[in-house]
């Protein structure tokens, strides 16, 4: 039932301006994964408990407090997963402290950013921090890993970024730059230094 509900969310955007931002958003969610439990009952119990826990959260926070509970919870879960992922974590997550420093550096000389871009955006944490500190109206990013690409799009939506104000593309920035002709006020990046890469001759004059 939950899988059907998630599919309906994606399908509801077909033919709409938001179709590209929601298409395949939940494709990596595997409710049959053995990581959720050994039996179907175990899996159902775990998923039910998560939904009940979310239902207990008071989302009635006044707007003046500027607290994004869902977004903060999502960021926290990503950070906890990254903490146990070792070197691989650098491929999809930038610690908040590092994100803040990089964001503060790129906004020097700018009262307000028109847009911000990350060519290796991972889960989008660095992009969101730079956009927040720089008050950017538009967010652009590209991510090679399909699963991490979906994480980034979810991160944008859960932080209240309107689908019309962000564009995250799935693809290798070196092989197929989706924003080659676009001008940006600021560019931030924490490249996946632990990822394997072959320095092909075609990149020598890139």
For every predicted segment, state its role.
Residues 1-106, 111, 164-173, 178:
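Non-catalytic, mostly N-terminal accessory regions of nucleic-acid modification and defense proteins
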Residues 88-189, 194-205:
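Conserved S-adenosyl-L-methionine
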């Amino acid at each position: 039932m939950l899988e059907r509900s998630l599919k309906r969310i994606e399908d509801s955007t077909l033919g709409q301006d938001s179709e590209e931002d929601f298409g395949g958003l939940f494709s990596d969610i595997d409710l049959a994964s053995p990581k959720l439990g050994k039996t179907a009952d175990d899996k159902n119990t775990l998923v039910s408990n998560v939904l009940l826990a979310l239902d207990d959260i008071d989302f009635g926070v006044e707007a003046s407090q500027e607290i994004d509970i869902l977004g903060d919870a999502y960021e926290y879960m990503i950070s906890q997963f990254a903490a146990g992922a070792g070197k691989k974590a650098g491929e999809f997550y930038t610690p908040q402290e590092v994100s803040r420093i990089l964001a503060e550096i790129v906004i020097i000389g700018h009262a307000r950013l028109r847009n911000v871009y990350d060519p290796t955006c991972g889960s989008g944490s660095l992009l969101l921090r730079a956009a927040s500190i720089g008050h950017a109206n538009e967010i652009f990013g590209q991510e090679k890993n399909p699963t991490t690409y979906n994480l980034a799009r979810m991160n944008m939506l859960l932080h209240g970024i309107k689908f019309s104000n962000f564009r995250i593309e799935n693809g290798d920035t070196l092989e197929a730059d989706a924003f080659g002709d676009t001008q940006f006020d600021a560019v931030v990046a924490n490249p996946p230094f632990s990822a394997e890469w072959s320095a092909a001759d075609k990149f020598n004059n890139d």
